[in-house]
Structure formats: C-alpha cells, structure tokens
Amino acid sequence: MQQILNDIAAEMALETDRGKVADYIPQLAHVDPNQFGIAVATPDGQVYVAGDASTLFSIQSISKVFTLTIGLGKLGDAIWTHVGREPSGDPFNSITVLEFESGRPRNPFINAGAIAVVDAIMMGHEPKETLGEILRFVHFIADDDSIRFDHKVAASEMDHRDRNAALAHFMKSFGHIKHDVDKVLGVYFHQCAIAMSCEQLARAGLFLVSNGVNQHTGIRVINAQQSRRINSLMMMCGHYDGAGEFAYRVGLPGKSGVGGGILTIAPGKGSIAVWSPGLDHVGNSKLGSKALELLVQKTGWSVFSN
C-alpha cells in the first residue's frame, strides 16, 4: 500500500491541470494549489500516507457526514423527517429543488440538507453546546483531541452567507427550520471550518469501513444498518452534481468538500482521505478524484469489483 500511495503522489506531482481553488470563500482562495496529500487507514490500525498528508485543510462539506452520523445517533430514523435521501442533480447551494419540494431538502449532503440536519441536532441548545458536541464527536472517531475549528474560515463564510441564509430562511418559511437562522448558520459554518489533515480524516472515517464500530476503541458509533445507509448516501449524493461521474470512475462511497478534500470509504478494507485544493467545474478536487481512480485501479477496491 505504501508503494501504491508513493506512486500516486509522484504521478500527481506531474499534473499540470490542477483545477481552480474555491474563491467565493476568501480564506480558501489563499490556499496554495500545488499541494497534494493522501492517506489510507485500515481496520488493523495501519495508516499509510504520501505527499502533504499532514497538512491541515478545511474539510468543508465532508463534515456533513459527521453531523448526519450525530443526527442518526440522536434521532434515529426520525432524522429523515427533516431531510430526504435522493440525489439532487443540482449544484450544492441551489434553491430550485427546495421550491418544488416545499422547502424539504433532497439529501443531507447539499447545503440546505446539512443546514436542516444542524437544526435537528441542536434540539433547543445554544450554538456553543452543539459545536462542542460536534467537535467531541470528531475527536472520538479520529482518536485525536488536537482537531480544532478554523475560526477565520468560519468568519469568512459568515461574512459571505447570503446564499446559505436564503436557503435557511426559505426552509424556515415552510417550518423545516425551528431555531434562529443565524444561530443555525453559525453552527453550520463552524462545522464546515473544521481543520484536519488527510491522516486525521482517514482515521475519522474508519467507523464507516467497519459497520459503525470505532476501530480505535472498539466502541460502536452507529449500528451496522446506519453505517451501510450513510455509505449508500455518500455513493449517491456525496459529490454534488458530479456523484454519477465519481461512482463511474471510482466506484466507492465518498464525500467531497470545496476545501479540496475527499473522504472515501472502501467497506471492510480502508478509509481513504485525499486532498488537493484545485477543484473541477462542479466543486470536487480535480487531482483528488484522479488519485482515487488510480488507487481503485491498483487495489481493486471498487464496490463493483468481483
């Protein structure tokens, strides 16, 4: 595995078309696009890394996997009264489908859906309490208490919140948001601003490799059925309106973020985190997607392989 990752990192270093760094969040626009990291964590406790795998980056929408997990843990199937389970086929911040579906988001991995999940898990608590719960959960699944919010990124997103605020207010007008919109958005922007490295992120994804069990502690995070269902949602909805292309080329459940990270799960085999800040036209890491396609070709880890 280490040689495979070394070879992939070397190949990515030669790529000239690295995509475009997200510029609508000013703090992300300053990130050096010439970076690439990859890490694979396996259920036996091994972690293999290559490239800039220890560099911290903003996980952005990858955090939606973690808040959905918290929501399933707290509410069970009742979480699905707040959000659907269907691919949207639209950009992650689109308001179009919301209008047709009476303000109920299509899935928890588009912005509107993730905001609805945050509202659901707040359960009357103040933002500070909910943020503490989210960060403690990430510490637990990654087995790393050093992970923190990047408050500068969160503030940058809050300053440019107009589209997300519109989504939240639209949902609230239909009764799908119960808390104060600014409080919900404050939590949402901070969860997206969690800073992690590829190594930390790969460790954090291991519970989805092992039917919901935290491999660091042996403690169950969610039940096996919930773990399978999160993976299925990652496969269908995890890459914005590029989910079909990712399934076609990589064939694994994954969740991307506009910070350039992708968390990918090979059930029973490994948790893969890749990061390169340059994005393709739908907002997924350009080199990250290429690297994962190479990894699957070299390992045969696609869920569609015999």
Curated annotation (Swiss-Prot):
Keyword Repeat: no
Record: residues binding substrate: 61, 111, 157, 164, 188, 240, 258
Annotated GO MF terms: glutaminase activity
InterPro entries: Beta-lactam/transpept-like, Glutaminase
Enzyme class at the top of the EC tree: hydrolase
EC number, as in UniProt: 3.5.1.2
Keywords on record: Hydrolase
Taxonomy, superkingdom: Bacteria
Reactions that this protein is recorded to catalyse: L-glutamine + H2O = L-glutamate + NH4(+)
GO terms under biological process: glutamate biosynthetic process; glutamine catabolic process
UniProt similarity note: Belongs to the glutaminase family.
NCBIfam families hit by this protein: Gln_ase, PRK00971.1-1, PRK00971.1-2
Assembly and binders: Homotetramer.
PANTHER family: GLUTAMINASE
Protein's name according to its UniProt entry: Glutaminase
Organism encoding this protein: Psychrobacter cryohalolentis (strain ATCC BAA-1226 / DSM 17306 / VKM B-2378 / K5)
Name of the encoding gene: glsA
